């Protein structure tokens, strides 16, 4: 990066929008001055990669929001942003998983720059700028990362020229590395005056020092009350006090058996949207058949 003021990184299976450069230019001009910003994403996530949960960030009028998530499907850095990461990396080539870092990110190969960048972002409480509309997309072609072609991470590209509205960080919507909402100007969910940790994607394994947890995961802690999953994005079901039994509000200091009925059917319906159960059954059987076939072929190969 020493020879360049900024860098746009694109892998060979990435397609960019015709307005990606305009977005990149204005994002750099807007966010370079803020030390908490250490990257700019061209890609717009629509699912949480760890478990495929649907992701829709709350919109507040800005063309950008902030998230503690880096990715390799269209990423921008300025010299200042990259050098800050590189300096951290030189002294953290071995590092313990930060509380804010997802298990699946920490488990990536140690040759992955993304593993270290995620460690940097989550340990130093930094953020990346993300667009509400995508300026790059992943064609998900067969290669090192994908054994079969797919469309899971393909997104619709934004087209046309426009003047972007990009809010300062303190006015943006915030999400963490688990794609969970953080307190900001538009959102704050507390219980008895204490912040509630969000786990609506059911991906956390460590709850840190928090006493209260809102999760769609059925856990053996005392359930204070439950909420429904009716509105989008999912976190506003809490602030709007939506009735239902899909989200559990836990007191983590009280361990006890959760005897409430399973919420898996309702949570699945919420995340798959209009897909019919017949189609889901077909896909499930097809994937199971392919996996069994792969396992059999591996065993036969070993015998030879």
PLM region spans:
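Peripheral/terminal regions associated with large enzymatic or DNA-binding modules
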Residues: 1-9, 14-304
